[in-house]
Amino acid sequence: MQTRKTNDSGRPLRSLYLLYHELRPTPSEYSYVVQKAQFEEHLNLFASIRNSPHSELLPDITFDDGHISNFEYAAPLLQDRGIQAHFFITVGWTGHKPGYMDWPELRLLQQAGHRIGAHGWTHTLLTHCSSKDLQIELVDARKTLEDKLGVAITTMSLPGGRFNRQVLAACQEAGYAHIYTSIPKTESLPPGPMVGRLNIRGSMQADWVSSLFEPRSASLARLEREYRIKAAAKNVLGDRLYAKLWSLLNRAEPDAISGNPSDHENTAHH
């Protein structure tokens, strides 16, 4: 959490929320995988930015899905640098899906000072959900996290970044104060109810990531333009066709495929 509100020149500080998914010790063709050594370089960069009195834009780290690499690789590196992150958990996968964290790991992350938020129950796109499905993905997920961890859960990360008015209304009704999206943009301190994030890919090396934090960053402006183009493509193609195209272009692996709220029956009481 940030305590400063301005830099040494009196300029108001802003945050750039960064979205990670999975870390691996070796390279992967799946674009959402970041190498462990690469993540360490990112953290060294972020520590330097945070420690500079001249910085106007500060990094905030988030993880989606709850992959076990978040605990095995990311958590020790974060602890070494005194950096706290925000982990959004796909609740139905917890303790059930191979390669993803169980409740003991989540409790240890929480005890280390990291924040825990919800990322649905099955990772189904919320725009595809009925009212009953939204109850599972939003309310059941939040209540299960609260019961298992003993803390209030007030943050939700949208699977696939997809939302519409119905989804936002359901999130608010379910008790979430902050909704984290995949819209690449900077945020005020503290952020508003809709929080944008920049999706970090394996191709993004530390030198390029550094350019995002430059004043009037051309790299960040390009990502914002690309997001608007992709959003227009989603509107034309529809979610399902766009998701197939996304999987092909990003070399998505089976773990990246969304689930189905009917899976709730298999995991709800464990």
Where are these regions (language model features)?
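Short glycine- and acidic-rich boundary segments immediately preceding or forming the N-terminal edge
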Residues: 1-47
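Short acidic, Gly/Ser-rich segments with clustered Asp/Glu that frequently serve as metal-coordination loops
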Residues: 65-72, 77
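Short, acidic/turn-prone active-site loops that include or flank metal/cofactor-
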Residues: 90-94, 182-187, 200-201
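Extracellular/periplasmic catalytic domains that process cell-envelope and extracellular macromolecules
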Residues: 9-13, 80, 187-189
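C-terminal domain-boundary segment and adjacent tail
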Residues: 33-57, 146, 172-190, 239-270
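Short, acidic/polar
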Residues: 36-38, 42, 70-72, 130
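Metal-dependent polysaccharide deacetylase catalytic core of the NodB/CE4 family, i.e.
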Residues: 14-30, 58-59, 67, 79-167, ...
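Membrane-proximal basic amphipathic "stem/tether" segments
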Residues: 1-14, 196-270
